[in-house]
Amino acid sequence: SLILFLRLRDIPVNMRAKGSLQSIVPKIRPLFLPLAIALFFRMFLAVSMTTYLPIYMRFNGASLWMAGASLSILEFAGVAGALMSGSLSDRLGRKSILLWITVISSLLMLAFLYSADWMLIPILLILGFTSLSSAPVLLALVQDHFPDNRAVGNGIYLTMSSLLRSLVMLLVGMAGDAIGLQSAFFWSALISLLA
């Protein structure tokens, strides 16, 4: 924050006219209904890998240290993916990047479930890079559709995302209790392909 402040403090601020909220209402359903459906399916992979990964690792015999490190590895790679995916989507298109992210991360999750121990860290790095990189692309997609009301569009998206994440977290947890985390992770990877 300090670096941004120091670099941007001398840039003049141009206030644009605020957009009308009435202009945003007709755009809500055509964008957010399909986005909510895709996000719901996509959340299965994201929730499985971020919320339940350490528990999954412990159930499969990993040490407590390795279980915690696996989440750190995934999240660390996700930061790099998030930083790169926004720029890539500007050049290659939002939908194509989201398609590739979804397919690659789902296949990598399946590979993670059935890989040898020595392959876990490389797979987690690539999986984190791909699976956690969709958020900036989705935010950019929302901003593309609401150029005059970006804050409202982002607020609707983030609220929807938080609510869906909470719901999917419960569903994956209940599935993990009922059929085991291995099966819940497997089905989460397949369900995320529906996005």
Each model region followed by its residue ranges:
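Helix-to-loop junctions at the C-terminal end of transmembrane segments
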Residues: 81-93, 176-177
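A late C-terminal transmembrane helix in Major Facilitator Superfamily
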Residues: 145-181
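Juxtamembrane intracellular "pre-TM" segments in multi-pass secondary transporters
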Residues: 9-35
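Structural signature of the two symmetry-related core transmembrane helices
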Residues: 96-111
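Extracytoplasmic gate region of multi-pass secondary transporters
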Residues: 30-82
